[in-house]
């Protein structure tokens, strides 16, 4: 399963750089450069948002609130040039999962995203549905711990 990430940063070069590295890691990435553009996608079926705080028309904090209102469990990482302790504390108090200050090491960003994805989502090869446990990788189904024999 490929995980999908939305990025909002009005610095096009930085946005494109992060997107390129995430795509090399196997993520499907959608980039937005304006608050309004990102707001239209707040309900997208993605696994994580990477949000710059200083945007064109409104703040990343406002976008965060919009996303969390409809998707309260959505993992969100703030990234910002606002590197004062006060700014980081506000971001984390709002409920973000992480706060990365610019400039940053892209490898560190990738590792933070990888770790958050692992913590936030169960093994994608295993599904629970209507009391059944389905192991897609091994192609086996279990009901109450007992394997269900499937035939064609």
What are these language model-derived features?
Residues 12-30:
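Two-component/phosphorelay signaling modules centered on CheY-like receiver
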Residues 8-9, 32, 49, 100:
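Conserved sequence signature across two-component system core domains
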Residues 52, 80, 151:
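Conserved phosphate-coupling serine/threonine residues in phosphotransfer and NTP-handling enzymes
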Residues 45-51, 55:
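Active-site beta3 strand of CheY-like receiver
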Residues 4, 114-152:
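Short, Lys/Arg-enriched segments at the junction into DNA-binding effector domains
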Residues 31-40, 60:
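Helix N-cap/capping motif at the beta->alpha junctions
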Residues 2, 45-47, 71-75:
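His-Asp phosphorelay/catalytic-motif detector in bacterial-type signaling
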Residues 11, 59, 65, 69-128:
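Basic, amphipathic DNA-recognition helix from helix-turn-helix-like DNA-binding domains
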């Amino acid at each position: 399963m490929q995980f999908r990430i939305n990025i909002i940063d009005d610095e096009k070069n930085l946005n494109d750089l992060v997107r390129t590295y995430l795509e090399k890691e196997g993520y499907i990435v959608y980039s937005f450069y304006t608050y309004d553009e990102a707001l239209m996608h707040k309900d997208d079926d993605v696994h994580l948002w990477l949000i710059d705080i200083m945007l064109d028309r409104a703040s990343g904090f406002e976008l965060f609130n919009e996303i969390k209102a409809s998707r309260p469990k959505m993992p969100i990482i703030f990234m910002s040039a606002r590197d004062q302790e006060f700014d980081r504390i506000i971001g984390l108090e709002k409920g973000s999962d992480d706060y990365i200050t610019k400039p940053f090491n892209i490898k560190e960003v990738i590792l933070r995203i990888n770790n958050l994805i692992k913590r936030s989502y169960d093994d994608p090869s295993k599904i629970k549905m209507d009391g059944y446990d389905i192991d897609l990788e091994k192609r086996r189904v279990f009901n109450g711990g007992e394997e269900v024999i499937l035939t064609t």
